[in-house]
């Protein structure tokens, strides 16, 4: 089975589903908060025209997900799988934002756990690109066990390039840290990391 960039994923806390064009209004209702974007390279993404550009890029990516609360259906935010490299056995997770009321708790960990467990059924490494000055997201990556492997300029869809720190989490390290050892049911574990 090939890697699905837009899976439907569910936990007790969260429901992730492919982002649809008619999700714009509900997602912008979260994204219009300027404080969500204050450490992001594009701090104007709370503005509707700027967010429309982000949303268009998300739709064209083929990997964007809408995040909702499993119990209530409340819109929480969005994230994305992108840059799948089957030869290298890697995929990236990013473009994530969450409503502020979900910051500082277990939501980001629950989200990344769902996405990492899906990814590690197919690839050996997950990459994250984080804005160099986004200390909140960089702290979250440290807590998640991400290892810095470099820096690179990233030009988000229709935006100017900015320096991003590249983090990696390898399947073996994740499984050791979380106590998991098997690929999701019915999936090949894929190539093992040699790094």
Question: Language-model segments: which ranges?
Answer:
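A short, well-structured alpha-helix characteristic of acyl/acetyltransferase catalytic modules
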Residues: 1-53, 164, 172-195
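Conserved GNAT acetyl-CoA-binding A-motif
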Residues: 121-130
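Conserved catalytic-core motifs of GNAT/GCN5-like acyltransferases
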Residues: 129, 147-163
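A short, internal acetyl-CoA/4′-phosphopantetheine-binding micro-motif in the GNAT/acyltransferase core
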Residues: 68, 94-106, 131
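Conserved acetyl-CoA-binding loop-helix of GNAT-fold acetyltransferases
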Residues: 104-118, 139, 143
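A conserved beta-turn-beta hairpin within the catalytic core of GNAT-like acetyltransferases
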Residues: 84-93, 103, 107, 124
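Conserved active-site alpha-helix within GNAT-family acetyltransferase domains
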Residues: 134-150
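Conserved beta-strand in the GNAT
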Residues: 66, 74-83, 92
């Amino acid at each position: 089975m090939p890697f699905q960039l837009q899976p439907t994923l569910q936990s007790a806390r969260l429901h992730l589903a492919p982002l649809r064009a008619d999700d714009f209004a509900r997602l912008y209702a979260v994204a219009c908060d300027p404080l969500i974007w204050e450490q992001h390279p594009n701090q104007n993404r709370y503005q509707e025209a700027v967010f429309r550009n982000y949303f268009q890029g998300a739709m064209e990516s083929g990997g964007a997900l809408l995040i909702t609360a499993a119990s209530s259906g409340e819109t929480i935010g969005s994230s994305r799988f992108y840059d799948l490299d089957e030869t290298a056995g890697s995929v990236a997770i990013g473009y994530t934002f969450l409503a502020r009321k979900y910051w500082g708790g277990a939501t980001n960990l629950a989200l990344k756990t769902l996405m990492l467990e899906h990814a590690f059924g197919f690839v050996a490494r997950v990459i994250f690109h984080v804005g160099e000055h986004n200390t909140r997201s960089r702290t979250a990556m440290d807590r998640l066990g991400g290892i810095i492997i470099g820096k690179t300029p990233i030009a988000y869809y229709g935006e100017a390039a900015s320096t991003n720190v590249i983090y990696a989490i390898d399947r073996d390290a994740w499984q050791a840290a979380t106590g998991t050892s098997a690929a999701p049911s019915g999936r090949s574990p894929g190539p093992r990391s040699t790094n």
